[in-house]
């Protein structure tokens, strides 16, 4: 009997016809197969039987029957190290290393977090709510973004966590170093996001009707002086109130404070990326209510070595911490076991 799977439409595909989306997103092997499944009543869009020409929007929930004989995917287990912050019988909290893609895609058939999870836990001990090629996956981080992620060990918990994230009940905060000195200590960026007209893998702020509401807040933690080849830097703490693809990176580009090291959203005139080959973006904090024991769990992950090496180059250019910067740095030092008080994130 074919399993029923769920899929949430990302803003990368918003505005696409349903039959095209089912094929383009890899849910069915061909567009014609997708059409047959729709017409057979085996696909539901937001709880209703759709037409093949219906348009999908970011956040739409698709329930579909798996084509077992054609879409079954067998992932090879791969012995990729995982840094596990928390584990019980229902879920995991991991600190994803930079460069690790979450699940296979046409350009990355292996070497992913999913391959690592089935090696360490076995495919039968992981949730499969997003299909057999994405065991354990509940939400994603960009491949070059490091930090804390939730993974599920069974479908029941996977669906609950997915819904909590959709409802914005999971608190996720990011550390982000951007070009230039942001003037205000706090900010709110309310700018809809849609995929780029010119490059489908790139997102942009857009006034199109299909663009999805996107809200990011930030707190400045520390500023650094200008140098010979740059206009200074600002370390910010970002929080998402929506979960659009590349949201922080797009919003920082929108306010002309590009993320340091970002190869996709960058200003060609900003020549100093402090030696980074990936964006300075790290999911450093996560807090959520455990769906089974009802305890609130929170975790903090320190900056990885490459980001520490980058920001340490600014130690002699520090202007000072903000009030929020002092709070976060104190919590960060306590979490990392740093007993000697430091005056800057560039000195940790």
Regions found by a protein language model. Name each.
Residues 1-348:
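RNA pseudouridine synthases
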């Amino acid at each position: 009997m074919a399993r029923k799977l769920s899929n949430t439409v990302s803003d990368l595909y918003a505005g696409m016809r349903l039959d095209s989306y089912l094929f383009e997103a890899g849910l069915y092997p061909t567009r014609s197969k997708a059409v047959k499944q729709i017409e057979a009543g085996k696909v539901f869009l937001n709880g209703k039987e759709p037409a093949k020409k219906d348009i999908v929007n970011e956040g739409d929930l698709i329930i579909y029957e798996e084509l077992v004989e054609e879409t079954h995917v067998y992932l090879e287990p791969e012995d990729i190290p995982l840094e596990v912050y928390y584990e019980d019988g229902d879920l995991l909290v991991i600190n994803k290393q930079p460069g690790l893609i979450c699940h296979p895609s046409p350009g990355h058939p292996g070497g992913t977090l999913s391959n690592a999870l089935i090696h360490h836990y076995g495919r039968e001990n992981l949730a499969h709510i997003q299909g057999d090629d994405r065991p354990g996956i509940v939400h994603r981080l960009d491949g070059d973004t490091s930090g804390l992620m939730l993974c599920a060990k069974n479908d029941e918990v996977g669906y609950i966590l997915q819904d909590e994230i959709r409802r914005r009940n999971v608190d996720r905060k990011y550390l982000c170093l951007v070009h230039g000195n942001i003037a205000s200590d706090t900010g709110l960026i309310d700018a809809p996001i849609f995929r780029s007209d010119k490059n489908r893998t790139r997102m942009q702020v857009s006034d199109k009707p299909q663009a999805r509401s996107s809200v990011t807040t930030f707190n400045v933690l520390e500023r650094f002086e200008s140098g010979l080849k740059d206009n200074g830097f600002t370390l910010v703490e970002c929080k998402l109130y929506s979960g659009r693809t590349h949201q922080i990176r797009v919003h920082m580009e929108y306010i002309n404070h590009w993320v340091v090291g970002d190869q996709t959203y960058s200003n060609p005139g900003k020549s100093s990326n402090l030696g980074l080959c990936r964006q300075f973006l790290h999911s450093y904090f996560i807090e959520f209510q455990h769906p089974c024991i009802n305890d609130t769990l929170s975790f903090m992950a320190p900056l990885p070595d490459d980001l520490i090496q980058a920001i340490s180059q600014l130690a002699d250019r520090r202007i000072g911490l903000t009030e929020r910067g002092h709070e976060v740095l104190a919590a960060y030092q306590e979490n990392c076991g740093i007993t000697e008080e430091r005056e800057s994130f560039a000195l940790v």
